[in-house]
């Protein structure tokens, strides 16, 4: 409780992200946190219809990542930093666990206190 929740993923399909974020919402994790940091979610958009890796999910039948964020996370009206470049990209930004931080939503940065 009262912590900053950081979420990021790589290569996950939008319907799975929707399911996972909805599970967090139902567990009241978004309500209980003080703020949310969302990483870049690299390669997490639906593949084209002709993509051989398509597992049968019709691309037009799923929400986009932006729609999922707007419908599942933003209604909580928590301070939310979107597209924070950390973890799975270069340059890599380290987010220390348990550290006290402040979110600067205007400059899109995290300040260690």
Question: Which role fits each region the language model picked out?
Answer:
Residues 16-113:
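C-terminal active-site/capping subdomain that shapes the small-molecule cofactor and substrate pocket
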Residues 2-23:
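Conserved mixed alpha/beta catalytic, RNA-binding, or beta-rich assembly cores of soluble enzyme
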């Amino acid at each position: 409780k009262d912590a900053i929740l950081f979420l990021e993923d790589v290569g996950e399909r939008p319907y799975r992200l929707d399911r996972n974020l909805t599970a967090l919402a139902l567990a009241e994790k978004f309500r209980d946190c003080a703020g949310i940091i969302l990483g870049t979610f690299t390669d997490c958009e639906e593949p084209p219809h002709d993509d051989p890796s398509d597992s049968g999910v019709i691309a037009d039948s799923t929400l986009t990542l932006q729609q999922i964020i707007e419908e599942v996370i933003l209604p909580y009206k928590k301070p939310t930093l979107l597209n924070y470049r950390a973890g799975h990209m270069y340059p890599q930004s380290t987010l220390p666990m348990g550290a006290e931080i402040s979110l600067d939503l205007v400059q899109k940065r995290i300040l260690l206190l």
